[in-house]
């Protein structure tokens, strides 16, 4: 349910270029009218706040200082539970084609692990990646490419 709220918000406000300065109370009321549960709405809004905080933190500079570009990401057991082999392979693919950097990959993994959901699949990961790339300045080209990957697949054109 939390993933549904995030996708709804992303498509309604961010992707559609709608007015972004919406009061939290108004937003909560709209989400309640759309049929979402209060506890899920709260969790989704906290998740978005944490995404915004990641962008403003020194995490990315600390990550890039510690990781060589040729290093391989070793996933924890908990991360491997959430991110199956297909998801991890997709993250690696996006790094190899320069859609994700080391920093944005770590932000994506952080936000994936921040989700409170028992089910998580590749399509969910693609949406999380899109949200992270949209939120981090300087990633416009990567965002556009990821958006094409997501929407082309949804329309059934990608072979």
Swiss-Prot record:
Belongs to the Smg family. HAMAP family: Smg. This is Protein Smg homolog.
